[in-house]
From Swiss-Prot:
It comes from Rhodobacter capsulatus (Rhodopseudomonas capsulata). Residues 1-27 form the signal peptide. CDD domains: PBP2_AvModA. It is found in: Periplasm. One of its GO terms (biological process) is molybdate ion transport. The gene is modA. SUPFAM superfamilies: Periplasmic binding protein-like II. It comes from the Bacteria. The complex is composed of two ATP-binding proteins (ModC), two transmembrane proteins (ModB) and a solute-binding protein (ModA). GO terms for cellular component: periplasmic space. The keyword Nucleus does not apply. GO terms for molecular function: metal ion binding; molybdate ion binding. This is Molybdate-binding protein ModA. Molybdate binds at residues 64, 171, 190. Belongs to the bacterial solute-binding protein ModA family.
Length: 252
């Protein structure tokens, strides 16, 4: 069985002390596994959550499939914010999460993006040109990668592009491949490029891929943790929803 470090909780407390946060006596800590595409909004939400409640959050960011495997192997996560809806539901079904605690916190959007301002037009025609590489997230563990495959199949370009795919272990790595020029274009989350200057992009039409519903769930390890429950409740507040929408997600 995989062994996980037990220093995450101590690290959160130490960080709070270093930052000079005044934590109330009842303040707690929550350890959250969060899909890589949600990194920036999660950080902003976490800071506001601490400000409002005194509870601290320790985040781990990465591919949802990898997190699910770690959860089944005893990782100390208390909250799971997945990039899909299936894994949180599976966590409930297999006894790793609290029944009835899963909900959709965001619906993601897929974009084809390039660091080159002239590379991608607003119809994605570049996919039918002689591309050297196309970056995507691993479709086996990252829902945005699976969505990218679906798009290419529906456009009839997958067979041509499959040998040219550069696969990142997460959507963050797929973005890095495109941002650094290791791939001229890449399928990334809209949240990763919204508000960024430079580059060019094509917002992939929603009818080319299944909705990327991103669900959160309370894991059994956090079932009795007031901070973990409070964090999930906070995700549903108007303040948190405003942050989520600011990063280009749709909320239900």
């Amino acid at each position: 069985m995989t062994q996980f470090p037990q220093t995450l909780r101590a690290g959160a407390t130490a960080l709070a002390l270093v930052m000079g946060l005044a934590l109330p006596a009842a303040a707690g800590e929550v350890i959250a596994a969060v899909a890589a595409n949600f990194t920036e909004p999660a950080k902003e939400i976490g800071a506001l959550f601490t400000e409002k409640t005194g509870h601290t959050v320790t985040y781990a960011f990465g591919p949802s499939g990898q997190f699910y495997t770690q959860i089944t192997q005893g990782a100390p996560f208390e909250v799971f914010l997945s990039a899909d809806a299936s894994r949180p539901k599976k966590a409930v079904e297999e006894g790793y999460a609290v029944p009835g605690s899963d909900f959709t916190y965001a619906v993601g959007k897929l974009v084809l993006w390039s660091a080159d301002p002239a590379r991608v037009d607003d119809k994605g025609a570049v996919l039918k040109t002689d591309l050297e590489h196309v970056a995507i997230a691993d479709p086996k563990s990252a829902p945005y990668g699976a969505a990218a495959i679906e798009v290419m199949q529906k456009l009839g370009v997958y067979e041509t592009l499959e040998p040219k795919l550069v696969t990142g272990k997460s959507i963050s790595q797929a973005y890095e491949f495109a941002a650094t020029g290791n791939a001229p274009v890449g399928f990334v989350a809209y949240s990763q490029v919204i508000g960024k200057e430079g580059g060019s992009s094509w917002m992939v039409p929603q009818d080319l891929y299944k909705p990327i519903k991103q669900d959160a769930v309370l894991l059994k390890t956090g079932a009795e943790d007031a901070a973990a429950k409070a964090y999930l409740d906070f995700l549903k507040t108007p303040e948190a929803l405003e942050i989520i929408r600011k990063y280009g997600y749709v909320t239900e």
